[in-house]
Amino acid sequence: MATQFSASVSLQTSCLATTRISFQKPALISNHGKTNLSFNLRRSIPSRRLSVSCAAKQETIEKVSAIVKKQLSLTPDKKVVAETKFADLGADSLDTVEIVMGLEEEFNIQMAEEKAQKIATVEQAAELIEELINEKK
């Protein structure tokens, strides 16, 4: 006889640590004279900020940052880095279209509309640009 189930249990202690028992996929328990049951115990740790380095070249990131600053008329002292989101700089959808047009002109590329619409950060733009340049080679 086999029983299929899925469950999730979470226990929290006063020291802000959480023990979580979970089956993310249904578990199969079979009774053939033996008990097959396993639990996955893990302690949740408060999340920490994760910094991810980008795959795009620094030179590309800097060019994209300069174009974004120009298109949005930002002051020279405004910091625009790889992780910077266009929306955080006050860009709306029209501004984003203008940024994409500026990038296409500067790098002599054409971005497909569906890919261009997914760009939200300087890093994403730089990675897409490098991908398109490499495809042209």
Curated annotation (Swiss-Prot):
Where does it live in the cell? Plastid, Chloroplast
| PTM | 4'-phosphopantetheine is transferred from CoA to a specific serine of apo-ACP by acpS. This modification is essential for activity because fatty acids are bound in thioester linkage to the sulfhydryl of the prosthetic group.
In terms of InterPro entries, this protein maps to: ACP, ACP-like_sf, ACP_chloroplastic, PP-bd_ACP, Ppantetheine_attach_site
Task: Give the note.
Answer: Plants over-expressing ACP1 show altered composition of fatty acids, with significant decrease in levels of hexadecatrienoic acid (16:3) and increase in linolenate (18:3) content.
Keywords, in A-Z order: Chloroplast, Fatty acid biosynthesis, Fatty acid metabolism, Lipid biosynthesis, Lipid metabolism, Phosphopantetheine, Phosphoprotein, Plastid, Transit peptide
Principal location listed in the UniProt entry: plastid
The record places domain Carrier at: 58-133
GO molecular function terms attached to this record = acyl carrier activity
Q: Is NADP found in the keyword set?
A: no
Q: Which GO terms describe its cellular component?
A: chloroplast
Q: What is this protein's function? A: Carrier of the growing fatty acid chain in fatty acid biosynthesis.
> Per the similarity annotation, which family is this?
Belongs to the acyl carrier protein (ACP) family.
Biological process (GO) annotations held by this record are: fatty acid biosynthetic process
Which positions does the record annotate as the modified residue O-(pantetheine 4'-phosphoryl)serine?
A: 93
Q: Which Pfam families match?
A: PP-binding
Q: Where is the transit peptide?
A: 1-54
Q: Does the keyword Metal-binding apply?
A: no
The highest taxon in the source lineage is Eukaryota
Would you tell me the protein name for this molecule?
Answer: Acyl carrier protein 1, chloroplastic
